[in-house]
Amino acid sequence: MAQTVRVNVPRTILDWVISIGTEDHLSENQRQNIDAWRQGAKRPTVSQLHGISDKLQVPFGYFFMDEPIDDTPPVYAKRTIGSQQPQGHPSRDLVDTIDQMTAIQDWARQDRIDNEGTRLEQVGSRTINDGSDLIVKDIRRALKIDEHWYRKSGLHDPAKAFKLLRERAEGTGILIMQNGVVGNNTHRPLDPTEFRAFTLIDPYAPLIFINKTDEPETARLFSLVHELAHVWLGADELYNDTALPTGVTRLEQVCNEVATAILLPDEDFLETWQSIPNDTTLDERMKELKKRFPVSHTALALRALKHKLISQETFQKCNQAAQTWSEETENKQGSPTFYNTELSRFDSRFLERLASSVAKGGTTYLDAYRLTGITGDTFTKLMKRAVS
């Protein structure tokens, strides 16, 4: 009979692994075993450590390290809210998502160096001292949109607006990724209260990740344009501001100014507001404005408050009614197919370049599987759709 193999895990390592993991996922039996290991009453088996590693969502190898490490991604220190506070620990869902995006960025960086060799001129091309107006002009020029781009072809619909701006941004070489779960694990949804988006700056392959659980679509659209401003400013960010976009630092103020100028230009807003008859009810006025701009009802009300077109009391009423208005105007669509969902997660140019590299032997299937989290026939079918 094979003997059960037990291993020594120092208490300092055990305590550290548990402190950075998803402890509330542990079963009562696992908690009792951990208490016994801490007291030295018995030692864990390899199988038990594997089980706890899975529940904590922490790499199995961490149990065998000589001393604790800090695996907090550097971008966590660049979060919008709380960056000046004690760091704490990000969730394992966020850590694993950033790790996957970093791996994709590393691959894309090397691919660009090998095939084109040039840096992207927009990365870090502006500073906050340049002001938001110049950054807005630069982004419009790069994305080939004019000041009133949202008036065309139903682009007041935030879903259509997001699709257009994402495609245009990808065309400039910026990687745009989005997901609502960790990889393909539907049991690990991303928390929008922890982060809405993040940007990883690199001169060859800047990457923007959008948290797809951040609702409604107008929130993701705002995050996308906000993060584009970070690319022009060459500044990493973990965007976790869930409050009204007033900004907390000059950097954030500039990025918010850029986003609002592109999505809701001041002059156009005022002209539209004044074109609506004075006796129009608030509900009807908001619905009319929503037909013109790809922003939330709250953003529209906030702009009206800024120009003293409504009172603070009316703004509060608008804010409270925003959820109802959003539900009434939401674009009801059927559920996307599996492959459409997978394609939407990845930057389109990244998938095209990856498919080409695999076909030429520059990237192994194993590495491609690791980058995408997709294997076998599913990967092959996805690549065919990506290049079709």
Q: What residues fall within each predicted segment?
A:
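Active-site hotspot residues in diverse enzymes, especially metal/ion-binding acidic/histidine motifs
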Residues: M1-S388
